[in-house]
């Protein structure tokens, strides 16, 4: 990984820098490129605009690593309110959640309780919940909670990160369950004993994992793959592979991040593919912004120029 990205991922955990950035105008300007707003109303408006372009969405109230049960329950209540707004507004969106935001660091039982409240409410209104994957320490707890919930609910899916060595085994397990799987490259700073350090190796593993998900075994079990990438080469591979395998466009979807490559998003929908946009919102945008800056250094240079010109 480039040094710049490693540094930004480390800084994403700095509370002092967070407090500075959330009040720094240029940082807020850049954040609005990647975040649909700070309020629920702004988020719903953004998703309505996506719907007009035939784009689906997965809304996420930003936040992670809460430190109290009260914070975890407040985050759960916010997501339940979000679901009500989705139903009332009739927007084409599910929700994404992070288990550390629901209290996983405090107690797996607390996170499981809060997650089930969200999934149960989503099932009532016919919506889907995606459990985001966080850093390596949370992979197994996340999969454990997902599997426990999968026994009772089918409107829930999970995320697999291609840069982790263990992901092939995890995908095999999820195929046996017939789960919905979002496949991403991975955005956390992981050591080389658990993750591929080179982008080329991650990309190669991404294709291997996608082949697993698109395999006859995967199709037979009911797996629904979500190919989550902005990498044109991987998108072209997925289009070619599914065409050659006779997999119709309604048996998988592409997923991208809000504000990134909107022209490509529209091109894919025009070609008949399902495209879902991960759409984050809320005042806790700082860690998310730092991860996006790590992926796009040009935005970092703009931010630094603005800071030193104050």
Regions found by a protein language model. Give the residues of each.
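Positively charged, amphipathic and often flexible ligand-engagement surfaces
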Residues: 1-310
